[in-house]
């Protein structure tokens, strides 16, 4: 089935998930919406995030997608279940995938969750981690400056390094062996985060596990694209197309992308 896979996020962070889907499923077409005009979602109310997520999902439903991936942890926490109940196609989130990746890797069951305020407040990661291993010690840390840093496109250089180190200061005297990047923007900062927490710590994104989930779901439903299909990805941003283009083309390394402005209602 050669219909596209829909991927949604508050901004450019979901591109980290899209990249893994493209790598794992090279014949699949991605239709991506980044709500860059209203990013970040972390400080917003649950109702606002739910409404915005539904707007993106409905826009992609009209484009006849075969699956939706909510590539945003904050949106997954508040909207996944309602979308799964009401959409005519499978809907995947990123939180369970991130928790699974961490439980597989941690040796000491001491896990840091770096995320937005909204995701931390939701308690969704704690619930997912403890459902997999009740002895997991979880250290949640909201990093509200990280998403605006990535969205600005200025995430390399000395200023970014200082900002990231400052955001991670509360971890200084904590004991942990694994860090979950509980926001899909954060893998773009992964090298800087690894430099702060140390090379002996596992720093994990949910992107790879989410792409694996997508592949398994499509295979189970018999809706994988034909092996000879040439994908035709489309990207939509509610905010600045040039800024989105700069980040997306740099991160995805897919050449010139088809990127358009979209208005959500």
Curated annotation (Swiss-Prot):
The source's superkingdom equals: Bacteria
- Which residues of this UniProt protein bind substrate? 9-10, 41-42, 73-74, 184-185
Quickly give the catalysed reaction.
L-glutamate = D-glutamate
Gene Ontology MF terms: glutamate racemase activity
Q: Is-annotated flag, keyword Transcription? A: no
Family, according to the entry, reads as follows:
Belongs to the aspartate/glutamate racemases family.
Function, as annotated: Provides the (R)-glutamate required for cell wall biosynthesis.
- Entry protein name: Glutamate racemase
Question: What's the source species for this entry?
Answer: Lysinibacillus sphaericus (strain C3-41)
